[in-house]
Amino acid sequence: MNINPYFLFIDVPIQAAISTTFPYTGVPPYSHGTGTGYTIDTVIRTHEYSNKGKQYISDVTGCAMVDPTNGPLPEDNEPSAYAQLDCVLEALDRMDEEHPGLFQAASQNAMEALMVTTVDKLTQGRQTFDWTVCRNQPAATALNTTITSFRLNDLNGADKGGLVPFCQDIIDSLDKPEMTFFSVKNIKKKLPAKNRKGFLIKRIPMKVKDRITRVEYIKRALSLNTMTKDAERGKLKRRAIATAGIQIRGFVLVVENLAKNICENLEQSGLPVGGNEKKAKLSNAVAKMLSNCPPGGISMTVTGDNTKWNECLNPRIFLAMTERITRDSPIWFRDFCSIAPVLFSNKIARLGKGFMITSKTKRLKAQIPCPDLFNIPLERYNEETRAKLKKLKPFFNEEGTASLSPGMMMGMFNMLSTVLGVAALGIKNIGNREYLWDGLQSSDDFALFVNAKDEETCMEGINDFYRTCKLLGINMSKKKSYCNETGMFEFTSMFYRDGFVSNFAMELPSFGVAGVNESADMAIGMTIIKNNMINNGMGPATAQTAIQLFIADYRYTYKCHRGDSKVEGKRMKIIKELWENTKGRDGLLVADGGPNIYNLRNLHIPEIVLKYNLMDPEYKGRLLHPQNPFVGHLSIEGIKEADITPAHGPIKKMDYDAVSGTHSWRTKRNRSILNTDQRNMILEEQCYAKCCNLFEACFNSASYRKPVGQHSMLEAMAHRLRMDARLDYESGRMSKDDFEKAMAHLGEIGHI
């Protein structure tokens, strides 16, 4: 049956008509081809905003550097990055006065957390630039290659288990005259072809030792790899994002943790909270502003937009901020916190794959890798690219990278930049004029509230705020920010009008079928609808329609229409046969051609549980048979997580309940990867998985604790098994003979 999607809005209050204005249903745009152009754009723009700063050449890397701090004050409304350090420090002093003890407490907590953080913290995170192979790898792999390569250079800090000794190794590695590391080289072998004349050339990946000089190593350690940001809606042009290497990650982690401790205690910060907690914080801020409004006065709200937030910020400001925040901390911790901003102010951007050019006859295409961009005549590029390359020239390094000292890349210091934004909001007033401002800040997004006796004074306040921000290197966009009376604004895609407007249109893209497997998809679909009823004000009629839409979508995706429907097809043939031979047809899962019995009352129950008592015994036996090879019991234990992609903002993790049945299959990975140099990675992964399974067999999950101390996994397991064996022997569950055998085995293992 066809359902009109506008039924989704049957019982929604009028303000929520905002939901109808989001045309975000289809697939978002993905990038393809080279991202080099976007990265070069970022490099050029960032330098343009800072071009009146101090220019010099780095003693270490030989790169062209620009320092815009304390640069000339702007004379127009164009974006500029000339933050005045004394203004930044004064804003932080005011924050310190308003929140006595906050900086000390945050520093103390961050320091204590750092002392107990282990190296494995760095395995969290997605792609990481791996300096040994000069491309992105999963975070755990990049950490592993770094640690194994460090060992070749007598840097064994990681073996102590803590993050601090590993970070000490990173600092030491920057001073080594040369670094040895493992890289992967393809060795070509000529083999006679079996089925025809001639030879086959076979590539065999080999792990080889390689070495690079100090300068080359430092350049790699400071490199950020760049990609194009995917799935960004509502923009014509794509933009570049960056991935830092493992050397930078450990230091950034600590600074961000420090900033997070501060943000948690600032009422103006929209981070690190989210969801309903964030809404409560916002509502409080609005109520507070309205209650502070002078009698007969007016309260205005600016829905703010900052121009190029990241590109106008500067690592040197962040250095000043960490120094100020950690003022009362031990010197070693202050030094530790200063490393991330220092590394960032010397960062180098890798430019990606390079450009494609075509021959004059348009017959041949060639990819020009980044190191060779300037080795071919500029006339060969189109006009747009030619203009870009001319501007890039002063900052280009011969390895095909670009020096990028000013500016921050996307997503690197979200928390610390939020602290800077809140510092601007916390000033409240300049020169005791007759207005007061306050607001909310979440990374680059802000909302500004201004109270005053009349509209003109409010405007005066907004202009003063604009100028204050300029002094901190923040550029509020006059074109894109708009002002209303308080009570109606938007902040981080939450629309406020006398309360938060329900806006589930943002979630519409995630209402589809997730594509994990039939069992998980049903659970995820229902959980999303349930969550939207709880969090986004989705009404009952709407939810009922959403269930029907989802079931229709699910049946089309998995070609599992009802057994009594007229749909033809390979799978339908089997489903119809099952339908004919089943007595309790209500007990068939939707994936097996059964009816849908979900409604608003039972959304939270997994389908197998819901239909359990309606199933035929034979069907139930097949569906849930533990020996059935399709019942993936290991992969599902209680709660699972899925990645959900809303129309805006980052991918969200979502928990759902799942019961394991024959529909909980897991897909096999792509086989073509087995012939590449990543094969070693897969073999290592499998080895780790086996180790972890063995460890879990020794320690049941109830006895997991964060590892403290210097035991290896092997010693811990041997120790645990000895204890278990002794308990079994003493209680009579184990014979003397078996006990002695077990102890002998463990004795051998313990000495490997």
Swiss-Prot record:
Keywords: Eukaryotic host gene expression shutoff by virus, Eukaryotic host transcription shutoff by virus, Host cytoplasm, Host gene expression shutoff by virus, Host nucleus, Host-virus interaction, Inhibition of host RNA polymerase II by virus, Nucleotide-binding, Nucleotidyltransferase, Phosphoprotein, RNA-directed RNA polymerase, Transferase, Viral RNA replication, Viral transcription
Reactions accelerated catalytically: RNA(n) + a ribonucleoside 5'-triphosphate = RNA(n+1) + diphosphate
Major site of localization recorded for this protein: host cell
Biological processes per GO annotation: DNA-templated transcription; symbiont-mediated suppression of host gene expression; symbiont-mediated suppression of host mRNA transcription via inhibition of RNA polymerase II activity; viral RNA genome replication; viral transcription
Similarity annotation: Belongs to the influenza viruses polymerase PB1 family.
Subunit comment: Influenza RNA polymerase is composed of three subunits: PB1, PB2 and PA. Interacts (via N-terminus) with PA (via C-terminus). Interacts (via C-terminus) with PB2 (via N-terminus); this interaction is essential for transcription initiation.
Listed HAMAP family: INFV_RDRP (MF_04065)
Annotated protein name in UniProt: RNA-directed RNA polymerase catalytic subunit
The organism of origin for this protein: Influenza B virus (strain B/Ann Arbor/1/1966 [wild-type])
This protein's encoding gene: PB1
